[in-house]
Swiss-Prot record:
Keywords: Aminoacyl-tRNA synthetase, ATP-binding, Cytoplasm, Ligase, Nucleotide-binding, Protein biosynthesis. It is found in: Cytoplasm. It comes from Limosilactobacillus reuteri (strain DSM 20016) (Lactobacillus reuteri). This is Proline--tRNA ligase. Consists of three domains: the N-terminal catalytic domain, the editing domain and the C-terminal anticodon-binding domain. One of its GO terms (cellular component) is cytosol. PANTHER family: MITOCHONDRIAL RIBOSOME PROTEIN L39/PROLYL-TRNA LIGASE FAMILY MEMBER (PTHR42753), PROLINE--TRNA LIGASE (PTHR42753:SF2). Catalyzes the attachment of proline to tRNA(Pro) in a two-step reaction: proline is first activated by ATP to form Pro-AMP and then transferred to the acceptor end of tRNA(Pro). As ProRS can inadvertently accommodate and process non-cognate amino acids such as alanine and cysteine, to avoid such errors it has two additional distinct editing activities against alanine. One activity is designated as 'pretransfer' editing and involves the tRNA(Pro)-independent hydrolysis of activated Ala-AMP. GO terms for molecular function: aminoacyl-tRNA deacylase activity; ATP binding; catalytic activity, acting on a protein; proline-tRNA ligase activity; transferase activity. Its EC number is 6.1.1.15. It catalyses: tRNA(Pro) + L-proline + ATP = L-prolyl-tRNA(Pro) + AMP + diphosphate. GO terms for biological process: prolyl-tRNA aminoacylation. The keyword Metal-binding does not apply. Its main location: cytoplasm.
Length: 577
């Protein structure tokens, strides 16, 4: 393919608002074009990469026994109202009305729609298990789109769904998808971790996340040098709290003017922050019409893990209380909240590290005052103890090794949904005994366009993108140094023909640009192999450069095809080490 015929608008500088390396380089290399905040056009090079990713996905899905289909992106809201996600999904859900004032959404995911098709199409367990998937654009009204195509309002996604008559069928489908996902990411050339994760708004109790370590990752991976890895929302560590043995002292209220944080209160009271209780008021949505105020107590040096609180309460949503909520339930302002004297209408949860404390300090539910020497049971109640904290780096993980943290990009997620959706939407089949039973579901997703950012983050350098050979837009970039010289262009065309006939995809830079511009653009674009046709063309010699390493070698034209094959094979083997 001739480069002069392809839209590749390279730039010398990235936009000033581009933060991530992948964002900067994909714009500079002419892969993407911003239409609006969070909305992108994928230009020819990017689209070629996407198609290669899709082909790998389709191949592995076929091997896993999944069948491709396609759902609409515009969905009637009725099913989402029936499942409860029309409200619980929050502000990220695009909502709209048609001309007849009927509610619709732009699909951020398709559990409900696939479940409806299954419900209306399959009535017997004999038709199960079934695994289906689609490759389709999704829509989420992100509050803060950022990092280019890493977090946008429209993006392509693989979403797959399994339907089984029993738990064994779900387990088999889940394991097959997990294997397929590993194969996909291995073939693409990503460094990734499979981690324990929280299911969030998806429902279900068991899930695993595939996360690509990267500096711009918005998730925190807690992992060890052993087998343990988890999203920070799910991560656990060995409990090391020691029961304090001090004699409970009389509770006292002390003035703490201007102290609104744990550390300010600790300084005012001359206490260690881990002896001060952090009291966080939340409003939990338990059902469509039921809301529960919840006070979560943490040791002062710990942070609340809201995902763990949601799971403990089994609630649909959890929101930090407003100032009005605090006044309504505790007659106080945030910054001076505490558990002493709190009424029964407020549920009190306390982290396990609070349980071992004696003579602790806490807010007095009065501005400018704190209690000291407050003790559980004597001075305030706790309705439920549990692990409600974020783990810390260096703590001991369940596998006995110290935890390490690294940021990661979520590139895939698999869920055991169980009957979360089928029970709500009436997806049932007759079992072997002729009884109606809810279908057992799994859900599986990969962010297709997000993968491009993840690969770029892990592989780009200061000169541009560096694509793995499996998804590069072309295999070889042929550059005649001087397109005005007939011998160089003739050799470039001959090389193009030879490589194409050998099964390689070739981009020939036939532009009448300076050599420096061509080489800079080639580095930006990131094609694995560059073949330079220069002054030695008259002797039948060309230079090969490996984009990833910068290594160069001169070869005769008749040896070129064989050498390119060897180099690409080596790159592929190194990628999979």
């Amino acid at each position: 393919m001739k480069q002069s015929k392809v839209l590749i608008p390279t730039k010398k500088e990235a936009p000033s608002d581009a933060e991530a390396l992948s964002h900067k380089m994909m714009i500079r290399a002419g892969y993407i074009y911003q239409v609006s905040a969070g909305v992108w056009s994928y230009l020819p090079l990017a689209y070629r990469v996407i198609r290669k990713v899709e082909n790998i996905i389709r191949d592995e899905m076929d091997k896993a026994g999944a069948v491709e289909m396609l759902m609409p992106g515009l969905l009637p809201a009725d099913l989402w109202k029936e499942s409860g996600r029309y409200e619980s999904y929050g502000d990220n859900l695009f909502k709209l009305k048609d001309r007849r004032d009927r509610d619709f959404i732009l699909g951020p995911t398709h559990e409900e729609t696939f479940t409806e098709v299954l419900r209306d199409s399959i009535k017997s367990y004999k038709k199960l298990p079934l695994v289906v998937y689609q490759l389709q654009d999704k829509f989420r009204d992100e509050d803060r789109p950022r990092y280019g195509i890493l977090r946008g309002k429209e993006f392509e996604m693989l979403d797959g769904y399994s339907f089984s008559a029993d738990q064994e069928g779900l387990d088999e489908a889940y394991n097959n998808q997990a294997k397929a996902y590993r194969n996909i990411f291995d073939r693409i050339g990503l460094n990734y971790k499979v981690i324990l994760a929280d299911s969030g708004t998806m429902g279900g109790k068991n899930s695993q996340e595939f996360s690509a370590p990267a500096e711009v990752g918005e998730d925190i991976i807690a992992y060890t040098d052993g087998d343990y890895a988890a999203n920070i929302e799910k991560a656990e560590s060995k409990f090391t709290g020691v029961q304090q043995t001090a004699v409970p002292a009389p509770i006292e209220k002390k003035a703490t003017p201007g102290a609104h944080t744990v550390y300010e209160a600790a300084e005012s009271l001359d206490l260690d922050p881990n002896q001060v209780i952090k009291s966080m008021l939340y409003i939990a949505k338990m059902s469509e019409d039921e809301y529960q105020p919840v006070l979560v107590l943490m040791r002062g040096d710990d942070e609340v893990n809201e995902a763990k609180v949601i799971n403990a309460l089994d609630c649909e949503e959890l929101e930090l209380a407003t100032e009005e909520d605090a006044e309504k339930y505790l007659n106080a302002h945030p910054g001076s909240l505490g558990p002493v004297g709190v009424g029964e209408e407020v549920k009190i949860l306390a982290d396990n590290y609070v349980k071992v404390l004696v003579n602790m300090a806490c807010g007095a539910n009065e501005d400018g005052y704190h209690y000291v020497n407050a003790n559980i049971d004597r001075d305030f109640r706790v309705d439920q103890f549990g692990d409600f904290r974020n783990v810390k780096e260096g703590e001991i993980a369940p596998d006995g090794q110290p935890l390490k943290f690294t940021p990661g990009i979520e590139i895939g997620h698999i869920f055991k949904l169980g009957t979360h959706y089928s029970s709500k939407l009436g997806a049932q089949v007759l079992d072997s005994n002729g009884r109606l039973t809810d279908v057992i579901m799994g859900s599986y997703g990969i962010g297709v366009t997000r993968l491009l950012s993840a690969v770029a983050e892990q592989n780009a350098d200061e000169n541009g993108l560096v694509w793995p050979d499996s998804i590069a837009p072309f295999d070889v970039h042929v550059i005649p140094v001087n397109a005005k010289k007939e011998d160089q262009m003739a050799m470039a065309d001959k090389i193009d023909q030879q490589l194409t006939e050998a099964g390689y995809e070739v981009l020939v830079d036939d532009r009448k640009e300076r050599a420096g511009v061509k080489f800079a653009d080639s580095d930006l674009i990131g094609i694995p192999i560059r073949v330079t046709v220069g002054k030695k063309a008259q002797d039948g010699i060309v230079e090969i450069k490996i984009r990833k390493t910068g290594e160069t070698v001169e070869v005769k034209q008749e040896e070129l095809v064989n050498t390119v094959g060897i180099l690409l094979k080596q790159l592929n083997e190194e990628k999979n080490k």
